[in-house]
Swiss-Prot record:
The keyword S-adenosyl-L-methionine does not apply. Signal peptide: none annotated. The gene is Mipep. Its cofactor is Zn(2+). GO terms for cellular component: mitochondrial matrix; mitochondrion. Its main location: mitochondrion. Binds 1 zinc ion. Zn(2+) binds at residues 493, 497, 500. One of its GO terms (biological process) is proteolysis. The keyword Iron applies. This is Mitochondrial intermediate peptidase. It comes from Mus musculus. Belongs to the peptidase M3 family.
Length: 711
């Protein structure tokens, strides 16, 4: 399946001028005149967007510089050109003798489809113009239809099979080419192309059914529930939107200070919906049928092939050991929260599932006096971008420059385009920063691959292009965009993904950048969170936007310590979700209903009681995009923690460690087995116990001592 590896992952310095950064630019890349279009990155983000003269009068380029996409109709042209080229490449693949050229042709075929599909995948949700969104949606459907045809093209499959079946020829290929060939074959076989015609037809039908069920389930996860006003006490009704004689419950209201509001929202929002329950059951059983049809014992076995964990047994071992190590800490967290609830609400002091987010926040605020608004003046967006610039420059020799955009290149006038430039290698790629709030914009922070990097036949390198989407407030006339500590951490997180895309400079776009196993893809982004919480890094950029005063060390220390409050209970909740995901995608038919399984798993892996007549699993949207892989965030965090402690804790600006990180981890994208990359970075092969210990030990870090030692 040629688009399988293209799945998106469902989170700053002026002075050292462009001349120094461009000194190493040679050959063709120097022909482009860059000196007049690059500017310091911090300044570009601390000013309100303007309709610049060059933007109004300059050459019209189309979205992302694609000439056809200056109008919505251009998507039709782009997809027709892609489909025409696809047919030609299929003929080439089928007529070329088996060898390395086979893999190159397959990768070009994948690139041809992904360049339209990935771009359209972003535009269909990110563009403010409905005409562009609809045209992009149609392009996605058109490319998807072509992919289905290729998935059932036996001649194309056999051309790859001839290569993989020749042991001597495979041994002559380099490791990356072998892996990419095997990944293409894996993508084919999970769609059932190796089966007889009847089973192949069943596999195609199941794939279509799973896609439809996934879309239906995902859509309903956010549907509000209604209840008659008369059924709720009058004094809490104003917390909910009204619809005539009904109240609309559209979420859990987890931060509401009134216990009764949280309880009502929890019980009503999570009340079972029969259609959604049936949809989930059909989705899980269809996934299981497809997995068995193509040769796997469970969907989880199929989904975990090629990951760090490799098998469901390893995942459950990881989750069980982590749960065991967390259990005592979690009990203490729950006891502390119950004490706070008793203090504030003596009449109803039992801790319930709707309580932890609120009471952990109360404890955090009381103990550390963390008021986000006190931090914001020190964290202007421009300052944070300069901080990233300093960090990337010291660690990797990379500088970010703001680059002018042409008319039609961006979808909103507040988009910033960054050129990512290495001190000796030159231009590495582009990051489009869609950072600011606007109507109908998706609320989740995301990283999108628009174009993957690859080595082209003429010897030049196709530069990667990505979009980072955040939801930050706009600058005003009086002050720039100011970030809360949480926003700043999210910015660093998403920039971790972007750097992975820029530095995962593989020969093949099928494995470029973040196109890697899910439990490895979050490692670079989570690692950036550790940098964002280190005072030595923060002190480089966190200065008051008016006075220039640095953010006091004590404030950073308090913030970091506050993040450890109730972290065991929060992580225990994630373990519960991950275990539930594994059980749902394990042996079928399921022994009990999904709700009974939820109740048992919650009792085993969480500790707070199941609430009768609720079905939280029907709101678990990650079952669609992260089916059997929800554990990935925990495992990625464990790996990132180990890398931080082993390589960057002593010196977060260590250039040798930064270069090793690039060489061993980022450079391979998905072109190398993830455990081999981790082993190369850590100089050892970590065990499940090592992963568990890394996560638990994070809760012990004495940041106060650490900051004092770093003077």
């Amino acid at each position: 399946m040629l688009l399988a590896a293209g799945a998106r992952y469902a989170r700053r310095l002026c002075g050292r001028g462009a001349a120094a950064a461009l000194q190493g630019r040679t050959g063709r890349s120097c022909a482009r005149d860059v000196s007049t279009s690059w500017s310091p990155v911090g300044a570009a983000f601390n000013v309100k967007p303007q309709s610049h003269l060059w933007n109004l009068l300059g050459e019209r380029r189309g979205l992302f510089g694609v000439p056809e996409l200056s109008t919505p109709e251009g998507f039709q042209v782009a997809q027709e050109e892609a489909l025409k080229k696809t047919e030609w490449l299929v003929e080439r693949a089928c007529s070329t003798p088996p060898g390395p050229q086979t893999v190159l042709i397959f990768d070009e075929l994948s690139d041809c489809l992904c360049r339209v599909a990935d771009l359209a995948d972003f535009v269909k949700i990110g563009h403010p113009d409905p005409a562009f969104r609809e045209a992009a949606q149609e392009a996605c459907r058109s490319i998807g239809t072509m992919v289905e045809k290729l998935n059932t093209n036996v001649e194309l499959y056999q051309s790859l099979q001839r290569l993989l079946g020749d042991k001597k020829l495979m041994e002559s290929l380099d490791a990356e080419t072998r892996r990419v060939a095997e990944l293409f074959m894996f993508d084919f076989e999970i769609s059932g192309i190796h089966l007889d015609e009847e089973k192949r037809r069943r596999a195609v039908d199941l794939n279509v059914k799973i896609l439809d069920l996934s879309n239906a389930f995902l859509m309903r996860t956010n549907f509000p529930n209604k209840i008659r006003k008369s059924l709720l006490p009058e004094h809490i009704q104003h917390h909910f939107a009204r619809d005539g004689s009904h109240l609309i419950i559209d979420g859990l209201h987890a931060e509401a200070s009134d216990d009764l509001v949280r309880e009502a929202a929890y019980k009503i929002f999570l009340y079972p919906n029969a259609d959604q329950l049936k949809c989930l059951e059909e989705l899980l059983s269809s996934r299981d049928l497809l997995a068995k049809l193509v040769g796997y014992s469970t969907f989880s076995h199929r989904a975990l092939q090629g990951t760090i964990a490799q098998t469901p047994e390893t995942v459950m071992q990881f989750l069980e050991k982590l749960s065991e190590k967390l259990s005592e800490r979690t009990r203490k967290d729950f006891k502390m929260m119950q004490g706070m609830k008793t203090k504030l609400n003596p009449q109803n002091s039992k801790l319930m599932p709707w309580d932890p987010p609120y009471y952990s926040g109360v404890i955090r605020a009381e103990r550390y006096n963390i008021e986000p608004s006190l931090y914001c003046p020190f964290l202007s967006l421009g300052a944070c971008m300069e901080g990233l610039n300093v960090l990337f420059n010291k660690l990797l020799g990379i500088t970010l420059y703001a680059e002018q955009t042409f008319k039609g290149e961006v979808w909103c006038n507040d988009i910033r385009k960054l050129a990512v430039v290495h001190e000796s290698e030159g231009l590495l790629g582009y990051i489009y920063c869609d950072f600011f709030q606007r109507a109908n914009k998706p609320q989740q922070d995301c990283h999108f691959t628009i174009r993957g990097g690859r080595l082209k036949e003429d010897g030049s390198y196709q530069l990667p292009v990505v979009v980072l989407m955040l939801n930050l407030p706009h600058a005003s006339r009086d002050f720039p965009t100011l970030l809360t500590p949480g926003m700043m951490e999210n910015l660093f997180h998403e920039m971790g993904h972007a750097m992975h895309s820029m530095l995962g400079r593989t020969r093949y776009q099928h494995v470029t950048g973040t196109r890697c196993p899910t439990d490895f893809a979050e490692v670079p982004s989570i690692l950036m969170e550790y940098f964002s919480n280190d005072y030595r890094v923060v002190s480089q950029f966190a200065k008051h936007y008016q006075t220039g005063q640095p953010l006091p060390k004590a404030m950073v220390s308090r913030l970091c310590e506050s993040k450890k409050v109730c972290t065991a209970a929060e992580m225990q909740l994630q373990v519960f979700y991950a275990a539930l995901d594994q059980i749902y995608h394990g042996q079928h038919p399921l022994k009990k209903s999904t709700t009974d399984i939820l109740m048992e798993t919650q009792e085993q892996f969480y500790g707070l009681p199941y609430v009768p007549d609720t079905a939280w699993q029907l709101r678990f949207s990650h079952l669609v995009g992260y089916g059997a892989k929800y554990y990935s965030y925990l495992m990625s965090r464990a790996v990132a923690s180990m890398i931080w402690k082993e390589c960057f804790l002593q010196d977060p600006f260590n250039r040798a460690a930064g270069e090793r990180y690039r060489r061993e981890m980022l450079a391979h994208g998905g072109g190398k087995e993830p455990m081999l990359m981790i082993q190369g970075m850590l100089q050892k092969c970590p065990s499940i116990d090592d992963f568990v210990d890394a996560l638990v030990s994070d809760m012990n870090l004495d940041f106060e001592t650490f900051f004092l030692d770093s003077k």
